[in-house]
């Protein structure tokens, strides 16, 4: 298996601002990034349609294969998955948390009767190319979680970058799809749900700082961002305004979500988004929808997760076609 050691196909940029010393301990507790490419038949014709699934996998509890099967039953368009809270356990994760780094791990991670889905195993099972970068360790056990990109299409060089430290280590990951009409960048991110104890506990200022740095790192003209933005105060937050000012919108043409929540547990909030930046008119259309397991949106979870999956159905403009 490729990826148990640092892979040159992923460049990781460390955070050098406030809190960088504490981040050393978070880094010491996780395993190596994973990158591998499966052998797939070459795509005979230019890609005209693309499906992007963005989903918080609830640390491997989500039934990813079931959702992929549902999407595959509806379309044969290439699929790209932007997964937050992807779970991974392999020999690269330290068997024990480092002594001085023991606190730099996510807590509350009890064993489960049903095994969690390992993102590396899932990518192999689904026959998808993978770029995975861990953000944090899962408690005392030898596993971690992070952001992942899985793709039917070949992935160009991937990059990842640490966000400003607010509560926990967060590492978005991006990759480039080399398409006929030009490069399309896909990015998977997860902002902090809250801040440290005290006046900053709600995390609004922290998420704004993380969004600011995210936008500094994501510079492409054509970008699809799948993210758990954790906007506890909704689109009133400065983080949302920053994304809007950077030309990100909810689709092409942009349409604000009609659903009232994406986080399925209480309190039900809209935390998850697929946002598109299309400065060059490379995309003919991009429509975002929320997937529900139960038509009445009932049940304790949604396909095993506490978040709804979001799907973007993207139509690409043929190369050379002028905007109407």
Which functions belong to the PLM regions below?
Residues 58-60, 86-89, 137-138, 153-156, ...:
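Short, solvent-exposed loop/turn segments at secondary-structure junctions
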Residues 50-57, 67, 71-113, 150, ...:
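Active-site beta-strand/loop signature of hydrolases that rely on acidic residues for catalysis
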Residues 2-39, 160, 176, 216-224, ...:
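Metal-dependent phosphoester-hydrolase catalytic domains
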Residues 40-53, 143-147, 151-157, 168-192, ...:
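Beta-strand-turn-beta hairpins that frame and shape the catalytic cleft
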Residues 60-62, 88-91, 138-142, 194-197, ...:
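Active-site environment of divalent metal-dependent phosphoester hydrolases
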Residues 1-125, 132, 137-143, 317-324:
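N-terminal, active-site-proximal structural segment of metallo-dependent hydrolase catalytic domains
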């Amino acid at each position: 298996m490729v990826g148990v050691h640092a892979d040159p196909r992923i460049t990781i940029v460390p955070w050098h601002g406030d809190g960088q010393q504490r981040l050393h301990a978070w880094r010491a507790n996780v395993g190596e990034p994973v990158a591998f490419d499966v052998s797939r038949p070459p795509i005979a014709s230019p890609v005209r349609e693309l499906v992007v699934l963005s989903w918080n996998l609830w640390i491997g509890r989500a039934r990813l294969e079931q959702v992929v099967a549902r999407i595959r039953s509806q379309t044969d368009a290439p699929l790209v998955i932007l997964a937050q809270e992807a779970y991974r356990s392999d020999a690269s994760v330290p068997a024990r948390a480092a002594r001085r780094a023991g606190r730099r791990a996510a807590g509350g991670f009890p064993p489960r009767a049903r095994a969690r889905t390992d993102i590396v195993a899932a990518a192999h099972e689904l026959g998808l190319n993978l770029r995975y970068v861990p953000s944090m360790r899962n408690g005392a056990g030898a596993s971690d979680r992070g952001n992942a990109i899985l793709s039917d299409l070949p992935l160009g060089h991937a990059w990842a970058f640490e966000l400003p430290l607010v509560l926990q280590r967060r590492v978005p990951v991006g990759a480039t799809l080399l398409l006929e009409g030009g490069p399309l960048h896909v990015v998977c991110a997860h902002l902090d749900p809250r801040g440290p104890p005290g006046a900053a506990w709600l995390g609004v200022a922290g998420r704004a700082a993380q969004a600011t740095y995210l936008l500094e790192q994501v510079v492409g003209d054509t970008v699809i961002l799948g993210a758990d933005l954790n906007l506890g105060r909704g689109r009133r937050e400065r983080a949302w305004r920053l994304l809007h000012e950077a030309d990100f919108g909810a689709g092409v043409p942009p349409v604000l979500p009609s659903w009232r929540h994406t986080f399925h547990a209480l309190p039900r909030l809209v935390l998850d988004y697929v946002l598109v930046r299309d400065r060059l008119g490379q995309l003919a259309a991009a429509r975002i929808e929320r997937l529900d397991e139960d038509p009445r949106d009932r049940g304790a979870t949604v396909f095993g997760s506490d978040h709804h999956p979001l799907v973007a159905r993207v139509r690409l403009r043929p190369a050379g076609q002028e905007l109407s």
